[in-house]
Amino acid sequence: MREVNEMRALHDDLQVRVAGLRGYLDLEEKRGRLEEVQRELEDPTIWNNAEKAQELGRERSALEAVITPMDKLTASLADGGEMLELALSEQDAELLAAVDADLDTALSLVEKLEFQRMFSGAQDAANCFVDIQAGAGGTEAQDWAEMILRMYLHWAESHGFAAELVEVSEGEVAGIKSASIHVRGDHAFGWLRTETGVHRLVRKSPFDSGNRRHTSFASVFVYPEIDDSFEVDINPADLKVDTYRASGAGGQHVNKTDSAIRITHVPSGIVVACQTDRSQHKNRAEAMRMLRSKLYEMEMQKRAVEKQALEDSKSDIGWGHQIRSYVLDQSRIKDLRTGVEVGDTQKVLDGALDMFIEAALKAGL
């Protein structure tokens, strides 16, 4: 348990930080907007336009997700100050311990809210797609791509995100050539956007009878799911659409009928595919959503590259930039951008990526 002076100092510090968060989050403006949204939803005629009603419902949930924890935090700190003085006046050690525990809870929530301030990008709150592509190197690289796929699926599951494998191309001997995951959840793109880049694996290959050390690469590209409010002009004449039978390492999560869809956007060379549903129509709709999202993100990256073309201090944006090295026989995984290094390689490959992601976000990558 903290000393009394430490409790007072922490309590005062938290109050200052919460006041800063209230201003940053425009809490009073959000509260006013929430009242407007609630009034609109209470109007029975709103359900004549189901789409608008659903949109307002989503906005209400998003506003409440900000306002409710901040109100609870403010009330908790106000009560905590009073309880601290009461515990001291009555020399109640049990109450003092309870106040200390409440301060820990408040500190954890404040740190979480401060961390979320880093999600300032226009699309950070969006769902996202994660594309994984094996590099050159045959079976070893394809096995590495599948390890990365597993890593992100485990990461998503541990954070309560819904992760759907929308496309997978199986490797010739083991692993995968490529895969696409649709990740749905609060700030999915904000969390994962700094994972875009080349991931390098160094290990003694289980596919080499001589047990020699091999270096393999796999590319990860993360892009936000774009809703219909964003205009992305796609000329149908620029599209090449193919159907095929789904196959791959997705097990029961991947459909095995002839309804799989592959769409090639000829001007850009972008290829997207979806094989999750037995309905060809639904797979086509999902593939088009992926294409729109990918075109949007590539345009945003193109603008960013042009803007930063003369600044070598900034990270390169795109597929060619190596971001992390996984040296398994030395039990070392190092992020080459932030310098963060971890020794428990299996834990990371099982989805423990937060240390890398948080450091990258704090560094403004």
Curated annotation (Swiss-Prot):
Broad class of where this protein is predominantly found: cytoplasm
Protein name: Peptide chain release factor 2
Parts forming coiled coils: none
Annotated organism of origin: Acidithiobacillus ferrooxidans (strain ATCC 23270 / DSM 14882 / CIP 104768 / NCIMB 8455) (Ferrobacillus ferrooxidans (strain ATCC 23270))
Entry-linked InterPro entries: PCRF, Pep_chain_release_fac_I, Pep_chain_release_fac_I_sf, PrfB
SMART domains on file: PCRF (SM00937)
Similarity-based family: Belongs to the prokaryotic/mitochondrial release factor family.
Keyword presence, Transmembrane: no
Pfam families named among the record's database cross-references: PCRF, RF-1
Function: Peptide chain release factor 2 directs the termination of translation in response to the peptide chain termination codons UGA and UAA.
